[in-house]
Every structure is written in C-alpha cells, then in structure tokens.
From Swiss-Prot:
The lineage of its organism: Eukaryota, Metazoa, Chordata, Craniata, Vertebrata. GO terms for molecular function: neurohypophyseal hormone activity. One of its GO terms (cellular component) is extracellular region. It is found in: Secreted. Coiled coil: none annotated. Disulfide bonds join 1-6. This is Asvatocin. Keywords: Amidation, Disulfide bond, Hormone, Secreted. The modification Glycine amide is found at residue 9. Belongs to the vasopressin/oxytocin family.
Length: 9
C-alpha cells in the first residue's frame, strides 16, 4: 500500500 492508496487490497 501507499500513504493513502492500497491498489493491492
């Protein structure tokens, strides 16, 4: 995940 985004789930 990133600071405010979790494209993997």
């Amino acid at each position: 995940c990133y600071i405010n985004n979790c494209p993997v789930g």
